[in-house]
């Protein structure tokens, strides 16, 4: 990635990662989802058309953090130890993280968001691979990889597991994890002493399932997806052509999901994409706060901001069975949780106020007591124009948008342009260290 990097300077570096977001899910890559802040960064920066991840949450994070292939970092797959080299499911001690390299070089190192490179998440378990022990000076986020956006599991500040409802340092009117991640990223910038440059890793869980969003954001997308997935996919493809993002020789890949006219639960399916869009929209809103903090402190000019996703859109069938399923066999006896209770379940049995968690086609998604994925057909839209999904090593699984913004380091003639040079996650650490 040396084509736009000036090796003489020491800029601040911010890497923002979305979770389970497809190649076409932001405006500057063809989406109808409103992402004005990312679009602004793209207009004044660079967009990569052939940037690749590893197709799955944990391997991507291991590769990003260490600048090595995931097997070299010990996480060739997920968080289970198979007994085979490269598959211990825990970040190796024989690799150094980007924070461990930048910190001795007098960079301040901050992380807000998802970690997901160790299985050791429970109280009393080893913290040797938690962020503070791997080079980050400040950390707020989740050690595990997925969970409720209204009550995320393994939420941690520094080295201490916390409940969002008993956290004296952060008490918003409504807790929503995407906001919490962006608010803490903004806090780290505001509280940075300015003596040295900083590295900030902003690792979102949005728009990974569950489909959780705030009502006002969902309302914004009401009716936007009534035409169904084929129409939305075609519109994205046409916008990509108009933007010059793809060569006209690239055609839409064959679909492997049911036609919209055969969808059994159209209203239910539409709701999923409305919520998904709201999740991406909210992520972008928070990015606007981060950019605003940089502008207020006059840091934007010499801050390299990189936005990527960990893998393509996800076709997993989370919570999509017919009917209604409860996460507890006797939902009537559930009791509210205490504010101090730690949430350690990826799929909680209940909300904080004691409402049972529900899944299935008879449950409209979006609220704290629901838990769904948006399914194969919408994931196919997310990955326009490619085929396959997260898990696969086809373009739909491993292609990610990459937006790079650095006013002081990217030449004016390159701004708003596309970079067609292929690149991979392992290039990011080397680029930052250089």
Question: Each PLM stretch: what is its role?
Answer:
Residues 3-434:
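Formylglycine-dependent sulfatase
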């Amino acid at each position: 990635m040396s084509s736009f990097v000036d090796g003489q300077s020491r800029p601040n570096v911010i890497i923002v990662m979305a979770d389970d977001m497809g190649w076409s899910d932001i405006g500057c890559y063809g989406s109808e989802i409103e992402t004005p802040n990312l679009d602004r960064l793209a207009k004044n920066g660079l967009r990569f058309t052939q940037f690749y991840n590893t197709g799955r949450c944990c391997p991507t994070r291991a590769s990003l953090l260490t600048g090595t292939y995931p097997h070299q970092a010990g996480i060739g797959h997920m968080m289970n130890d198979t007994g085979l080299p490269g598959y211990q499911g825990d970040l190796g001690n024989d690799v150094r993280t980007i924070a461990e390299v930048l910190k001795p070089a007098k960079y301040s190192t901050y992380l807000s968001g998802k970690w997901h490179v160790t299985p050791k998440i429970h109280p009393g378990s080893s913290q040797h691979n938690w962020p503070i022990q791997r080079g980050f000076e400040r950390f707020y986020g989740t050690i595990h990889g997925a969970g409720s956006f209204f009550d995320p599991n393994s939420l941690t500040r520094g080295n201490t597991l916390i409940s969002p409802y008993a956290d004296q340092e952060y008490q918003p009117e409504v807790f929503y994890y995407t906001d919490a991640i962006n608010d803490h990223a903004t806090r780290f910038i505001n509280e940075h002493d300015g003596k040295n440059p900083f590295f900030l890793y902003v690792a979102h869980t949005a728009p990974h399932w569950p489909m959780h969003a705030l009502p006002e954001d969902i309302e914004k997308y009401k009716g936007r997806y009534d035409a169904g997935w084929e129409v939305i996919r075609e519109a994205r493809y046409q916008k990509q052509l108009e933007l010059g993002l793809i060569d006209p020789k690239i055609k839409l890949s064959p679909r492997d999901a049911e036609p919209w006219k055969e969808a059994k639960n159209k209203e239910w399916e539409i709701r999923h994409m409305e919520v998904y869009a709201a999740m991406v929209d909210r992520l972008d809103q928070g990015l606007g706060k981060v950019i605003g903090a940089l502008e207020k402190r006059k840091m934007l000019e010499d801050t390299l901001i990189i936005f990527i996703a960990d893998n393509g859109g996800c076709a997993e069938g989370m919570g999509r069975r017919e009917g209604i399923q409860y996460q507890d066999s006797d939902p009537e006896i559930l009791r509210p949780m205490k504010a101090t209770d730690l949430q350690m379940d990826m799929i909680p049995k209940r909300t904080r106020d004691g409402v049972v968690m529900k899944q299935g086609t008879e449950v409209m998604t979006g609220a704290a007591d629901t838990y769904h994925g948006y399914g194969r057909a919408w994931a196919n839209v997310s990955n326009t124009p490619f085929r396959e999904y997260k898990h696969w090593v086809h373009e739909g699984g491993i292609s990610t948008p990459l937006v790079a913004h650095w006013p002081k380091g990217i030449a004016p003639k390159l701004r708003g342009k596309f970079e067609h040079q292929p690149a991979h996650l392992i290039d990011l650490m080397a680029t930052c260290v250089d």
